[in-house]
Design a protein with these regions (language model features):
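Helical scaffold of the NTase/Pol beta-like nucleotidyltransferase catalytic core
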Residues: 1-29
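Conserved NTP/Mg2+-binding pocket subregion across the NTase superfamily
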Residues: 3-4, 66-178
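Short secondary-structure capping/turn segments at boundaries of alpha-helices and beta-strands
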Residues: 14-16, 31-36, 72-74, 83-85
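Catalytic metal-binding acidic patch
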Residues: 31-68, 80, 88, 92-99
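Short aromatic-enriched loop/helix-cap "lid" or pocket-rim segments at secondary-structure transitions
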Residues: 40-42, 108-111, 212-213
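Conserved nucleotidyltransferase catalytic core and NTase-mimicking acidic/glycine-rich helix/loop elements
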Residues: 142-291
Length: 291
């Protein structure tokens, strides 16, 4: 754990008792870059608070007050799904809190692990649990981490089928030839995200977001060679020669197809390949007998 993570961890340990003092709170944990040990000067502190019954607005507000925090902007929450988000500051340090019911926390592994639900939001919850550090009642977190530790083959197949989806190659070639760079770069991001999602399924890693992707790729064993630098090179090459950047990215797509075909026989790539390789007819001149 680096120094930026250590002092944030210490502050989180000071904040946790304000939550665990409430009898409805079963456990408190620390997540994000701090629990991973790679926080930097921009990092906030991510807390997860697990409630046996939904917290009231008053309860959450009073905890922040006891912690001498200054409440931040109202964040989107979904009470019907069993979670509430909020943000506050302590001495200028931003604290992001995800309040979640125990019922929700115990339902998500059933959906993802037993029913192979590839929902990214649910996987993100499991990824957060696996990387979390306990701040109170550690046995509860350990139990959930043990549940989430085994990534099932069926989920791997579901993830690959869901995200092995690339628009026809000619679309990016068209954007490159037109020097329509804003849309082209946006499409680069979309394709790279889909590659990563497929690779997460191949490597049986829960989706945890698209931050710290070099760290994510470092956890993968089934991966195109030199993926991290090649991802970055796509944009660098395209800034000089857009079409060359497109071809570099398309090589990665083709290599991803090969990896799926090699390691997951249950996934039929033929339809996805055919769509990616589809070509549109070009018209340099007016077609014969059209006009």
């Amino acid at each position: 754990m680096n120094e930026a993570s250590r002092w944030r961890h210490a502050l989180a340990q000071q904040l946790a008792p304000h939550y665990s003092a409430n009898p409805k709170v079963m456990a408190v944990s620390l997540g994000g870059s701090v629990s991973l040990g790679c926080a930097d000067r921009f990092s906030d502190i991510d807390l997860m608070v697990f409630w046996t019954a939904p917290p009231t607005e008053k309860e959450r507000r009073e905890i922040i007050k006891r912690a001498r925090g200054r409440r931040g902007p109202r964040l989107p929450s979904k009470a019907e799904e069993g979670y509430w988000l909020e943000q506050f500051e302590v001495a200028g340090v931003v604290i992001d809190v995800r309040h979640v019911t125990v019922e929700t926390t115990e339902r998500i592994p059933v959906d993802v692990l037993e029913r192979a639900d590839p929902s990214l939001a649910k996987q993100q919850h499991l990824a957060a649990l696996l990387s979390a550090l306990p701040l109170s009642n550690p046995s509860v977190l350990t139990h959930w981490q043990h549940q989430a530790a085994t990534y099932p083959y069926e989920l791997s197949v579901a993830m690959i089928r869901e995200h092995l989806l690339f628009h026809p190659a000619w679309e990016q070639e068209m954007l490159a030839e037109r020097s329509d760079l804003l849309v082209l770069y946006e499409s680069f991001c979309t394709v790279e995200q889909h590659i990563l999602l497929v690779l997460m399924g191949l490597n049986r890693l829960y989706y945890s977001g698209f931050r710290w992707i070099d760290r994510l790729m470092g956890q993968m064993h089934i991966i195109p060679p030199n993926l991290a630098p090649r991802f970055k090179q796509v944009f660098g090459i395209a800034s000089i020669d857009p079409l060359a950047g497109v071809y570099q990215l398309h090589e990665l797509v083709q290599e991803t197809f090969v990896l799926v075909e090699t390691h997951v026989a249950a996934v039929d790539t033929r339809q996805a390949r055919a769509w990616f390789q589809e070509r549109r007819k070009h018209w340099e001149y007016v077609p014969d007998r059209l006009l």
